[in-house]
């Protein structure tokens, strides 16, 4: 048997497999299996060696057909695919810099970026602003914005991304705010997360996550970082 892996994000497993069923009918000797991971779905393509004269060509055709259908949800190839490595690589290729402001993740995003060799080319520094007072004093976010919208909000996540980007004159700024748990914050349950993403010259966007509170603090923080990296990857591939 010869296999190949592909990572897909933001797709319900049943929807994804239903969409791929017509494609796979054209390749009866290729089996497709899905594995649900915390932040993505891993597709494994398997073919019996010798079933085709050119195994690689068959995989290439199947992969191309799947990508044509699911390109906007595609993360990368291989079971050792590293999302942070991909993001850092694209930032370097495009000569862009990133910074961030983190609340619930407590610097985990910045640590993840810095774990990749060559990160100094795309990262000058960032902020850990755990308390509301730090968001105000270090980033310059107006107290009125936080008082009106709350710490755990789209507005605050976007402001964290905006103000951190402007402070360090970076191309990208990313902000993480939310509830790592186990207790609620501002009436929001554990697992509620907002991620803001600012890019120079473009409107700032945000994404809300509703992660299961039973996952625990560390899992919620880790998943938040992975979803933030996915947002970045999507922007860098535009």
State what each model feature region is.
Residues 54-238:
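Short alpha-helical segments enriched in small residues
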Residues 11-30:
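Short amphipathic alpha-helix segments
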Residues 4, 39-43, 207:
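Short amphipathic alpha-helical segments
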């Amino acid at each position: 048997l010869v296999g190949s892996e592909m990572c897909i994000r933001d797709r319900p497993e049943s929807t994804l497999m239903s969409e791929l069923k017509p494609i796979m009918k054209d390749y009866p000797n290729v089996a497709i299996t899905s594995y649900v991971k915390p932040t993505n779905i891993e597709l494994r393509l398997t073919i019996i060696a010798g079933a085709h004269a050119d195994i690689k060509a068959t995989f290439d055709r199947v992969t191309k057909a799947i990508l044509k259908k699911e390109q906007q949800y595609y993360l990368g190839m291989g079971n050792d695919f590293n999302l942070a490595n991909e993001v850092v690589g694209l930032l370097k290729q495009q000569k862009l810099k990133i910074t961030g402001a983190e609340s619930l993740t407590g610097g985990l995003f910045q640590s993840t970026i810095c774990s990749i060799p060559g990160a100094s080319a795309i990262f000058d520094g960032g902020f850990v602003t755990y308390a509301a007072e730090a968001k105000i004093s270090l980033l310059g976010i107006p107290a009125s914005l936080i008082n009106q919208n709350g710490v755990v909000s789209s507005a605050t996540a976007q402001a964290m991304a905006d103000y951190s980007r402007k402070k360090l004159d970076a191309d990208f700024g990313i902000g993480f705010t939310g509830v790592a748990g186990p207790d609620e914050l501002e009436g929001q349950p554990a697992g509620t997360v907002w991620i803001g993403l600012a890019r120079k010259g473009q409107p700032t966007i945000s994404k809300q996550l509703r992660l299961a509170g039973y996952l625990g603090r560390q899992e919620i923080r880790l998943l938040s970082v992975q979803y933030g990296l996915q947002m970045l990857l999507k922007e860098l591939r535009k």
